[in-house]
Amino acid sequence: CVITDELLVRRIRKKPLNGRYLEFDMPYIPVPLERERSDRRVYPRLCILCDAERPAVENQYFIQHGEDPRDVVLGILVNYMEEKGRPAGIYVRDAELFGIAGDLCAKTGVALSFSPMLKVLDFFVEDIINQFN
């Protein structure tokens, strides 16, 4: 996902580094939900950003049917950086998220890394799944 808004990039680059490390993922929640005006069940997709050190959920959002996940991911990252500064690093688990966030992170000086283990994030996702059951 290429970021073309240079004013946005400059504004974010001016934000201080906050020293935080974040975990970011877009898991499907394995609990089927009924969809309005349809007989098909859907598995909701959660976009969740966690502080890897505190541990705390910084933002979470259920992606709606038909909504572009790229817009959701970039919106969450931009909002975080504008409100709390640029994190020292962001850990993601999959190539899709890496591809969406890669250009923004590169242009704003934020390290983006793959990590198969996102312990804090997985703890919160498990808690959300348990609430559905």
Regions found by a protein language model. Name each.
Residues C1-N133:
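Secondary-structure boundary/capping micro-motif
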